Amino acid sequence: MARIAGVDLPSNKKIEIALTYIYGIGRTTSKKILQATGVDPNKRVKDLTEEEISKLREEIENNYKVEGDLRQEVAANIRRLIEIGCYRGIRHKRGLPVRGQRTRCNARTRKGPRKTVGAKRKEK
């Protein structure tokens, strides 16, 4: 099992897919990394040599923001939006959809489970 950017890559998968287990690397970025390092995308992780693993590790560390650094940057961006009090920041603070989706009947993922309000009975 190869360890790159603090993530154990699954050894039975192709390296092109295995790199996507790293936060911040998708299929397109994975292909770019493999092309830059000259590693065969169809090779399995268990078949990689130490030299290829170190090339991949070096390429990712020097040219891409991944895992903890990327998570910190995203959190800082959201914190900044909240601090300046813009519309997007307010939506983040209230836990509502940020990108203009309707909230009257949907948005359950952002709003969480329904808070049912009990109806008051009329006393006799």
Curated annotation (Swiss-Prot):
Keywords assigned by UniProt, alphabetized: Ribonucleoprotein, Ribosomal protein, RNA-binding, rRNA-binding, tRNA-binding
Region named Disordered: 98-124
Coiled coil: none
GO molecular function, one term: tRNA binding
Claim: Transferase is one of the keywords in the record: no
TM ranges: none
InterPro entries registered for this protein in UniProt: Rbsml_uS13_C (IPR027437), Ribosomal_uS13 (IPR001892), Ribosomal_uS13-like_H2TH (IPR010979), Ribosomal_uS13_bac-type (IPR019980), Ribosomal_uS13_CS (IPR018269)
Keyword 4Fe-4S: no
A cellular component annotation (GO) from this entry: cytosol
SUPFAM superfamilies: S13-like H2TH domain
GO biological process, one term: translation
Subunit structure and binding partners: Part of the 30S ribosomal subunit. Forms a loose heterodimer with protein S19. Forms two bridges to the 50S subunit in the 70S ribosome.
Protein task: Located at the top of the head of the 30S subunit, it contacts several helices of the 16S rRNA. In the 70S ribosome it contacts the 23S rRNA (bridge B1a) and protein L5 of the 50S subunit (bridge B1b), connecting the 2 subunits; these bridges are implicated in subunit movement. Contacts the tRNAs in the A and P-sites.
NCBIfam families: uS13_bact
Family: Belongs to the universal ribosomal protein uS13 family.
Identification of the protein by name: Small ribosomal subunit protein uS13
Gene behind the chain: rpsM
